[in-house]
Amino acid sequence: MNNEHAEVMEMHMPTEKIVGQTDLYSIKSSTVRTPDAMPRPIRVKAREVNVFYGSKQALFDVSIDVPERAVTAFIGPSGCGKSTFLRCFNRMNDTIEGSKVTGRIELDGADIYDGSIDVVELRARIGMVFQKPNPFPKSIYENVAYGPRIHGLASAKGDLDRIVETSLQKAGLWNEVKDRLHEPGTGLSGGQQQRLCIARAIAVSPEVILMDEPCSALDPIATAKVEELIDELRENYTIVIVTHSMQQAARVSQRTAMFHLGYLVEEGPTDKMFTNPEEKRTQDYITGRFG
């Protein structure tokens, strides 16, 4: 068992054990994640979703419910389909030549793959933060103001200023940049750039925020700040995060879904997934036997 897997095993309750394991796998609780007190309404519903890239099938009959105002983590080894599935939620796979998505994905009950859906509007409602920080080659202010401006969310300069300030505050960045808003966003540190990208997504008032390994390019201090931010944001947004770090999934999520070879193996409350998974593949992945 490598260090990361061992540390994950130390993040939960000592009275609960991974199925079939000895006391070696007993777990104690030290997560920063806020557990859910009660079930939440479903914000995104996926049913029998398949993804093809040309003749190659990358995802097989995936069905899942994503609750609102909670963090759902997608875990699994590289190439398992978790990022492919995440990109289905705001139709980013549409940008890949030869891709095809079948099945049904609903946002608030409406099929997002229906021909009447405005994809630009959809991507405002379901924002995305990528693995590598990608600020626009513009000022800090313009990085955040760009989306609200093109979507017509601000009718006056004062309105735009308020959106920029509020978004940067929600992203935990305002106090660090308020005196240099007109400096290039690319001049910020990596962690600050990622929080700027989160502020940019927030600025257009999304309902859902997708995060594809948002901390993989960050140092531990910047990662901790982003994880704390994720836990704060989930009070107002539905968040889905893809991560290779099971420590991160355990720290920030309320629900976890395990993928392997293009299939959804199982999903459920994060505490249960890490202490009493139903599937052996999940158990083996969490305990470091593969992946």
UniProtKB/Swiss-Prot annotation:
Residues 44-286 form the ABC transporter domain. SUPFAM superfamilies: P-loop containing nucleoside triphosphate hydrolases. It is a peripheral membrane protein. The keyword Transport applies. It is found in: Cell inner membrane. Keywords: ATP-binding, Cell inner membrane, Cell membrane, Membrane, Nucleotide-binding, Phosphate transport, Translocase, Transport. Its EC number is 7.3.2.1. Gene3D superfamilies: P-loop containing nucleotide triphosphate hydrolases. It catalyses: phosphate(out) + ATP + H2O = ADP + 2 phosphate(in) + H(+). PANTHER family: ABC TRANSPORTER I FAMILY MEMBER 17. The complex is composed of two ATP-binding proteins (PstB), two transmembrane proteins (PstC and PstA) and a solute-binding protein (PstS). Part of the ABC transporter complex PstSACB involved in phosphate import. Responsible for energy coupling to the transport system. Belongs to the ABC transporter superfamily. Phosphate importer (TC 3.A.1.7) family. This is Phosphate import ATP-binding protein PstB. It comes from Chelativorans sp. (strain BNC1). The gene is pstB.
